């Protein structure tokens, strides 16, 4: 009888302990979760590259190969004559001391800087504060991947983007390409606040791409500032396209929305294929030999493709002879439609 009672008590104790463990287990797991996340975030590292040996590496490529996802690479001032490739990396930041202090000049390969390489891409990689000089006609090549962000870099040559989603170019200077300044092939991206100059074409959007351009200055292109071909889609809002062979060319079956731009001092303002689809509004055209042309042999004027709210007005640039395309405070391009000003750059009264 005593043995039976003892067994019953033992079973009850076991059940109580088991219930208590089950009740406390979620709290234990939750208590451990933040520490695990903190452990993961604490593993992100900062690497330094310096040609004088004061960093952990003297070559940028060595630092990239060592870095893991989430790391940051800081590049000290100097010239780096090497071929740099970033691929199979996520959330990597590469930051130079400034585009007037850090120079990647390439060595043997076509393209001094590659982000992604077939079949490997790169995801959410940000590169900032350096200059890349073209090698073999290509400055920067971006292949595959997504979320590549170039900020405040100077590219002396072409930026070529192929099969990449969500590319973002911000406050960059791109110039001196032997072909195109920025070329998109079957990619999506956004260009904001860049200066693109002295190329054959400023920006070429081809294949099945979708690209937005806002507040860019594109000047001194041998041909069009922006060329859109294939089945691509483009949105251009408040850009200044001046001193080019042409402003914008809409080829093939392209679709585009074009609003608030300044297009001037060119042979042709806007050139259309018969198959293209465009929505134009509040664009200012000035001092072009022709504003709206239909492609053909020869091209013919097509004023019916103009936006109903487009204007033909002198922009009132500060000093166009010196490529200062800011607007004067008395510019005629202020407060037009829903824009406080047309073009890429604010008037002097609004400039900082």
Predicted regions and their residues:
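C-terminal accessory segments
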Residues: 304-352
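Right-handed parallel beta-helix
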Residues: 95-101, 123-134, 147-157, 165-180, ...
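Structural detector of coil-to-beta-strand junctions
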Residues: 83, 110-114, 138-139, 158, ...
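Bacterial N-terminal signal peptides
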Residues: 13-27
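Extracellular beta-strand-rich solenoid/capping regions of secreted or surface-exposed proteins
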Residues: 61, 66, 81-95, 103-147, ...
């Amino acid at each position: 009888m005593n043995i039976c009672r003892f067994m019953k008590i033992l079973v009850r104790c076991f059940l109580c302990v088991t219930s208590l463990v089950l009740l406390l287990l979620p709290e234990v797991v939750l208590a451990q979760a933040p520490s695990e996340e903190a452990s993961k975030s604490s593993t992100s590292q900062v690497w330094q590259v310096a040609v004088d040996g004061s960093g952990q590496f003297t070559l940028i490529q060595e630092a990239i190969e060592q870095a893991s996802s989430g790391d940051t690479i800081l590049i000290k001032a100097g010239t780096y004559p090497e071929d740099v490739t970033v691929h199979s990396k996520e959330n990597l930041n590469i930051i130079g001391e400034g585009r007037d202090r850090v120079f990647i000049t390439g060595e043997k390969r076509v393209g001094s800087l590659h982000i992604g390489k077939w079949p490997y891409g790169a995801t959410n990689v940000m590169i900032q504060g350096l200059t890349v000089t073209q090698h073999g006609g290509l400055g920067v090549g971006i292949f595959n991947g997504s979320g590549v962000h170039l900020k405040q870099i100077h590219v002396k040559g072409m930026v070529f983007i192929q099969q990449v989603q969500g590319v973002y170019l911000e406050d960059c200077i791109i110039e001196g390409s032997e072909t195109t300044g920025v070329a998109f092939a079957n990619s999506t991206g956004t260009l904001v606040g860049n200066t693109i100059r002295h190329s054959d074409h400023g920006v070429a959007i081809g294949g099945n791409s979708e690209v937005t351009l806002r507040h860019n200055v594109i000047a001194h292109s041998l041909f069009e500032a922006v060329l859109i071909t294939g089945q691509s889609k483009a949105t251009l809002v408040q850009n200044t396209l001046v001193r080019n062979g042409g402003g914008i060319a809409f080829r093939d079956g392209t679709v585009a929305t074009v609003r608030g731009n300044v297009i001037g001092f060119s042979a042709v303002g806007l050139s259309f294929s018969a198959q293209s689809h465009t929505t134009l509004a509040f664009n200012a055209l000035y001092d072009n030999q022709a504003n709206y042309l239909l492609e053909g042999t020869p091209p013919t004027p097509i004023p019916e493709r103009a936006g109903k709210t487009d204007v033909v007005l002198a922009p009132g640039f500060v000093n166009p002879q010196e490529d200062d395309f800011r607007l004067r405070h008395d510019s005629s391009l202020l407060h037009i439609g829903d824009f406080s000003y047309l073009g890429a750059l604010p008037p002097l009264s609004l400039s900082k």
